[in-house]
Design a protein with these regions (language model features):
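C-terminal catalytic "cap/lid" subdomain
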Residues: 1-143
Length: 143
């Protein structure tokens, strides 16, 4: 399913209450049928909604960093070498890496969602493994 709307205000109120929302990638078709939405898409759409939320005086409410966690330390130039992390990927890099086969399969929509997030207000996107979160290492996607 596609994401048509994210209620950033509801998420904002949960955050103000000290809660950490956990958002499942489930949507509905408006006719009572549940749909499984790509988790990367759901994360990207949520990040975009929060990045564009404004305070009462018109300022942006959040500086958003989106982190995609998976089993590798980042996007790899060589899938068999965990030390081959590509440090940064922008639009031009992405197309070149797709064309030469470095990026394929499930990594392609992940980076497409990451680029869309950055293009729509998200400060940066990091693709990494959970153990690297403290140091914020991995592949940074964006401009």
């Amino acid at each position: 399913g596609d994401v048509n709307h994210v209620d950033a205000t509801a998420i904002h109120h949960l955050l103000l209450a000290g809660l950490t929302p956990v958002i499942a990638p489930l949507t509905h078709d408006g006719q009572g049928h549940m749909l499984n939405t790509n988790a990367d898409t759901m994360a990207s759409e949520t990040a975009k909604a929060m990045a564009n939320m404004k305070t009462a005086n018109g300022e942006l409410a959040y500086d958003v960093t989106l982190v995609y966690c998976f089993e590798k330390p980042g996007v790899l130039a060589n899938p068999d070498d965990d030390n081959s992390v590509i440090p940064n990927i922008g639009h031009e890099d992405f197309q070149r890496l797709v064309d030469n086969g470095t990026i394929s399969g499930g990594m392609k929509p992940k980076i497409e969602n990451a680029l869309a997030a950055v293009d729509n207000g998200v400060g940066r996107v990091i693709i990494t493994q959970p153990t690297a979160l403290d140091g914020k290492t991995g592949t940074v996607v964006g401009r």
